[in-house]
Amino acid sequence: MNENLWAAPAPKKLSKHFFGRGGPLGKETGPNLFPKKPGAGKGLGFPPTKKPRGQPRVLKKPKWNSEGLIGILHRGSDGVQF
C-alpha cells in the first residue's frame, strides 16, 4: 500500500498541482508572475530579483581585487617591488 501510494499517485498529483500553481519549481513561477505583474523587471517577481542579486556580487569581487591587489602591487606602497 505505501509503495504504491509513494510510487505513482502521490508524485503525479503533487507535480500537477505544483506545476499549475508554480510552487517550488521556479520555472513555472516565471511565466505565471510576468503576465500577472506588469513591469516585473523592477524586481516585483522572484525570477527578476534573483538575477540582479547574483550580478552585483560577481562585479564587487573583481573590483575589490583590482583596487586592492593590483593597486598595491603596481604602486608598491606595501613594500613589494614589482
UniProtKB/Swiss-Prot annotation:
The keyword Signal applies. Keywords: Cleavage on pair of basic residues, Secreted, Signal. Expressed by the venom gland. Residues 16-60 are annotated as: Disordered. Residues 38-82 form a propeptide. Residues 1-17 form the signal peptide. Its main location: secreted. Residues 50-60 have a biased composition (Basic residues). It comes from the Eukaryota. It is found in: Secreted. The keyword Signal applies. One of its GO terms (cellular component) is extracellular region. Belongs to the non-disulfide-bridged peptide (NDBP) superfamily. Short antimicrobial peptide (group 4) family. This is Putative antimicrobial peptide 7848.
